[in-house]
Every structure is written in structure tokens, then in C-alpha cells.
């Protein structure tokens, strides 16, 4: 399906989309003017605040010493190693959907150039997230294990079910843009979390700390992504009629039920062999409620933070912690002190002033 990088167009043409072969790309309409983005005139200050937050917390996986977790990894039995590897395989697939299709779809409904800039940032970081899992794989797993994990993620029924449901929402040009935002928030704030449980659990037991540090950095990003896109959904929903708003809410809860039914099966597949299934289901129901809250809606499930394994809840905190940059990068970075330049900074004196340039040294 991925041919010469044209993943988006290939999906449109494939049977995954269901009959999209007959679709035609929109006729090209040339523009007569292109305007520069002006960050000094921002119509929605949430765009500016989100941009600043995202750029402030920029990170890369290569700065985190995952190899330091090898001793912990060797202590895990085969069942737990299988769960860790396949959890990250699933997360890689979902982040691939987000980076390649999700943000592209959302950018079709932007209202300002600043919103486009924020979504560009989010799209890049989703690619960083997807690449981060490969860093983990290359450190902890053998080449044969990595190959098996990716073959599994590309074919596993329940994982593919949720990836395809979300991708089809993104790729359908006739789909309501607000529904695409709902799908995005459900993926960001709900569906990822069956995978996030594992590294947070190990972090709470002081295991795989550097792997978990990557996940905490991803969690910190996803927290901002889900909140921002949920806000944009709420802004758009306010422009709809009362009936349209109710229809959207009815659809939203039905879609969540549909996703949760599949997520239950996926969770059993991943966690039954290690005995964590019930705890993970509580965790994902709690995060489904968080997704609804990001969209301005009431919770669906009775589960609250107090019902979640406290070891995992402690790890899910996205508050910033600093580490020495040259030993281990944490989910907060110490930045060098800077000051604004002024005219005197450009007052460079001639080093030869007052000297006879013809004189020998």
C-alpha cells in the first residue's frame, strides 16, 4: 500500500476506504494572492499559547539513553517482553495514522494561518513519536523480533480495526470536519492509552525508566494535542444549530461505544497473559472520559482517577521535571539563558584601528 511515499493517495484508492476508486481529486484552483503569516496579529490567542507550549517542550528520542534499560529488559520473562514489544508496535501504527493522515485532514478545516502552524508542529511531533518506538525496538529487540512485531501490527484484527476506523474518518472528503476532530481526540486521549499503561506500570516499579521517559514525553505532547484540537471542536460546534449539536453529540457517544467495544478485545489480546487486563480497562475508560471532557462533553463511564492503579496514575503526571542534559534528558530541559540583542551588539570595533597596517609585527 505504501508506494513511493504516496500513502494518502494509495489509501484513497484502496479497498480499505471502501469504493473510493471512483473518487476524483478536486479540480485545481490557482490562487491569485498568498499572504505571509503575521504572529503579531493573532485572532485566536489559543493558537499562540499552544504554539509556544509545543515549541517550549520540543524533544527528540535520540537524547534519551534507552540502552540503560537493558538490565531491566533482560529480567522480564517472555510473556512480559511480548507485551511490551507489541504494545509499542500498536502505538507505532496509531502514530503513523496521526502523522500521515490525521493532521493532513484537520488542516483542511483551519480558520487561520496560525492554526495551520500549530497543526504542522503537531504533525511533526507525531512523526517523532512514531520514530521513538523504533529507537526502543532497536535497543531492546532483535531484528527478527522487530520484523515479527511490525508484521503483527500490520495484520492484527483489533489493532487494524481501530486504525482503519480512524483513518477512514480522516480520509473521507465528504465527512464532517468536526467528526474528524472528534476522531483525532479519541485517538490522542483514549485509544493510545491501552499502550501507555505498560511503560507507566514499569516506571512505577522503577523499571525501564528511560523507555518510560520517552512515553512521558509523548504523554506531555498528547495532553496538549488533545486539549487544543478539542478546543477547536468546541469552537466549531458553537456555530451549529441546536439540532446539529445534538446530532453531533449522539454520533460522538455512539462512535466512542464502537471504539471501546473493539478496545476491550484488543486489551484482552495484549494483557490477558500477564494478568493486567482489568486494570488496563479501567485506565482506558478513565481516559475515554478525559477525551470527552476535551470535547466539552460529559463523561460516559463511572471510572475516575481514584479507580486507576495509583502506580500508573503517578506516572501519568505531565508536570515538568529537569535532568542534566549531558547525562539524561527528562521531560523538561534546562535552556541556556538568553537576552534580547540591541544596537550596541552591532557596534563592532575595527581591530586595526590606530595601527599602521603597513608596519611589520
Where are these regions (language model features)?
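Non-heme di-metal
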Residues: 8, 12, 16-361
Amino acid at each position: 500500500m505504501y508506494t513511493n511515499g504516496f500513502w494518502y493517495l494509495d489509501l484513497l484508492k484502496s479497498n480499505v476506504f471502501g469504493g473510493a476508486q471512483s473518487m476524483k481529486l478536486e479540480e485545481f484552483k490557482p490562487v491569485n494572492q498568498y499572504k505571509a503569516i503575521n504572529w503579531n496579529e493573532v485572532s485566536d490567542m489559543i493558537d499562540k499559547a499552544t504554539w509556544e507550549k509545543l515549541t517550549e517542550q520540543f524533544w527528540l528520542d535520540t537524547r534519551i539513553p534507552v540502552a540503560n534499560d537493558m538490565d531491566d529488559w533482560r529480567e522480564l520473562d517472555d510473556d512480559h517482553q511480548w507485551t511490551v514489544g507489541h504494545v509499542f508496535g500498536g502505538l507505532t501504527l496509531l502514530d503513523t495514522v496521526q502523522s500521515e493522515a490525521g493532521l493532513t485532514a484537520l488542516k483542511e478545516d483551519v480558520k487561520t494561518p496560525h492554526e495551520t502552524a500549530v497543526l504542522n508542529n503537531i504533525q511533526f511531533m507525531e512523526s517523532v513519536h512514531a520514530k521513538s518506538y523504533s529507537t526502543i525496538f532497536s535497543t531492546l529487540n532483535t531484528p527478527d523480533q522487530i520484523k515479527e512485531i511490525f508484521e503483527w501490527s500490520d495484520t492484527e484484527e483489533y489493532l487494524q480495526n481501530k486504525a482503519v476506523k480512524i483513518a477512514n474518518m480522516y480520509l473521507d472528503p465528504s465527512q464532517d470536519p468536526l467528526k474528524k476532530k472528534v476522531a483525532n481526540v479519541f485517538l490522542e486521549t483514549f485509544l493510545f492509552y491501552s499502550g501507555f499503561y505498560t511503560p507507566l506500570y514499569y516506571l512505577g516499579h522503577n523499571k525501564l525508566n528511560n523507555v518510560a521517559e520517552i512515553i512521558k514525553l509523548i504523554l506531555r505532547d498528547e495532553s496538549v494535542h488533545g486539549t487544543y484540537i478539542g478546543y477547536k471542536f468546541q469552537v466549531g460546534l458553537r456555530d451549529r444549530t441546536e439540532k446539529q449539536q445534538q446530532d453531533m453529540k449522539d454520533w460522538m457517544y455512539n462512535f466512542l461505544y464502537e471504539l471501546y467495544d473493539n478496545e476491550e478485545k484488543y486489551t484482552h489480546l495484549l494483557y490477558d497473559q500477564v494478568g493486567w487486563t482489568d486494570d488496563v480497562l479501567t485506565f482506558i475508560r478513565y481516559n475515554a472520559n478525559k477525551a470527552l471532557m476535551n470535547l466539552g462533553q460529559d463523561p460516559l463511564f463511572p471510572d475516575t482517577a481514584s479507580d486507576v492503579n495509583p502506580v500508573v496514575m503517578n506516572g501519568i503526571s505531565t508536570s515538568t521535571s529537569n535532568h542534566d542534559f549531558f547525562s539524561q534528558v527528562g521531560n523538561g530541559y534546562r535552556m541556556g539563558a538568553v537576552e534580547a540583542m540591541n544596537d550596541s551588539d552591532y557596534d563592532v570595533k575595527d581591530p586595526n584601528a590606530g595601527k599602521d597596517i603597513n608596519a611589520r609585527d
